[in-house]
Amino acid sequence: MQKKLNKIVNTTNNYLYKYFSKQKKTELIKPMLYGLLPGGKKVRSKILFDIGSIFEVDKKNILQVAAAVECIHAYSLIHDDLPCMDNDNLRRGKLTTHKKFSESTAILAGNSLPVSYTHLRAHETCVH
């Protein structure tokens, strides 16, 4: 079970890293990846892979949706940690995005993640 979960975490993180590595290098990419990739159990991704396997959905399609869901989840966590919300200093054992970069950068990075999700899904749908 743990081995399968680790594989899903690695597969999802690698997919997201490759996607963001192909994007134009802006000042937001680093804080977006910081809030998105390290740590986290990717439970949502595992649930999607489990449901997809039940209904025999192509794993590449599941991976695209899982990556999109992780973008939305990371957005919610980045915003939840902000001073106007919970004002947390740590997330997953490391500085929160607003503590590592700045509050305004965290807001913009968080806001950019759902947009990236939309672009990711549209790009994959059109390309494949």
Per-range role (PLM):
Residues 88-112:
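Divalent-cation-assisted or electrostatically stabilized phosphate/pyrophosphate-binding catalytic cores
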Residues 41-45, 107-114:
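Short alpha-helical patches at coil-to-helix transitions and adjacent helical residues
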